[in-house]
Design a protein with these regions (language model features):
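GNAT-family acyltransferases
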Residues: 1-105, 122, 165-183
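Structural signature of beta-strand start/N-cap positions in the alpha/beta core
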Residues: 8, 130-131
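Structural motif
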Residues: 27-28, 127, 151
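Short amphipathic helical patch at the helix-1/turn junction of helix-turn-helix
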Residues: 34, 137-138
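Positions that flank functional sites
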Residues: 39, 139, 162
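Conserved acetyl-CoA-binding loop-helix of GNAT-fold acetyltransferases
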Residues: 100-102, 108-125, 141-149
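Conserved catalytic-core motifs of GNAT/GCN5-like acyltransferases
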Residues: 133-135, 153-171
Length: 183
């Protein structure tokens, strides 16, 4: 578990299903996320799969970590309002992916920045990571702005790079080195 001023980042649990459903079923939230609008059954299935296959340690290529963001105190204490993921792409190269998604009612309040910055710090400190990468759809400038705020730089734009949810899309690649993050 990772603690920030306002959040507890922890592994997903089946008790989180109602909170997860609130944003994972929202078409605006999942527009740039690689899953469809989810039903309650799909949220349960995804949570069970994450619990069964997710890791708390990144040691081998393909290992991934998913942490939900739980509000620590106040009116929404105990509510899950988002999640971050980190996946080891290459142990040898020290490369890992990072991503985030925020509940629609809790956007633009600094939660995603707070949670993702804490996960970046945790990842660089505890795992064999030297470089974090975020792949961001070019139609999602808000996520690109967040990556920039986190200190990541845009390294590339891949034009018409993939078919995503039935449409051809371009992608930005953002990255940060461990040495840059520690400055």
């Amino acid at each position: 578990m990772i603690e920030t001023d306002r959040l507890l980042l922890r592994p997903i649990s089946l008790t989180d299903v109602d909170d997860l459903l609130e944003y994972q079923s929202n078409p605006e939230i999942v527009r740039y996320i690689p899953w469809p609008e989810r039903t309650r059954e799909q949220v349960i299935e995804a949570a069970e799969k994450t619990i069964a296959t997710g890791k708390l340690d990144l040691k081998e290529d393909g290992d991934f970590l998913v942490l939900v963001w739980e509000i620590k105190s106040g009116e929404f204490e105990g509510k899950v309002i988002g999640q971050s993921n980190m996946g080891l792409k290459s142990l040898r190269g020290g490369n890992a992916d990072i991503g985030w998604v925020t509940h629609q009612n809790f956007q633009r309040q600094g939660y995603a920045f707070e949670a993702t910055k804490a996960l970046m710090e945790f990842g660089f400190k505890n795992f064999p990571i030297r470089r974090l990468i975020a792949d961001i759809d070019t139609r999602n400038p808000e996520s690109a702005a967040m990556a920039t705020k986190l200190g990541m730089r845009r390294e590339a734009e891949f034009v018409d790079a993939e078919i995503f949810k039935g449409s051809l899309c371009s992608m930005w690649l953002y990255a940060i080195l461990k040495s840059e993050f520690q400055k």
